[in-house]
Amino acid sequence: GPKEFGNISFDVGDNPDTVRKNREEIQQRLGFNAWAELKQVHGEVFIPEAVPTSLDAPGVIKADGHATDVPGLALLIKTADCQPILLAHESGKHVAALHVGWRGNRLEFPISGVQAFCQHYGFSPQEVFAVRGPSLGPARAEFVNAAAEWPAPFLKWYNPETRTMDLWGLTKAQLQQAGLLAERIFGINTCT
């Protein structure tokens, strides 16, 4: 079927056996010992110590970000058009993963997620690298009621002519506001 290749979500109506097989294949190819999966809810809850979950079932902890310092524990974030943001301390010993949709941007989750990550492990945001993965690009993030959906300070990222929001630019600004250095923020500018 159309969802068979590489699908790792139990939540989209795919055959559960196919999903399990895809999850096992990813584990084998990437070589991690275990992974931690969340039940993503488009919010701002951050789990500072990720909880390993089974490859055989969906995540149940309702949150949109988690972190770990456990070697071999992979952090799973699932996205379609939302932004996956991976954070890593410069030592390589601490990592975090955030799921940021437009609601997460509006909640300023890139800021609070970085703050929670740094506070929990006791380091400065200036010591952190960030990579934003493929997501809905600036030319495609359409909002027909932007004034109703976004508070005024966010509208500088909105183009009224195209009715689109530059979520990539907004996220970079939020990561910088959280204290990350601009030269440590990267983006994979592939629009989903």
Task: Label each region the model flagged.
Residues 1-192:
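Active-site microenvironment for binding and transforming phosphate-containing groups
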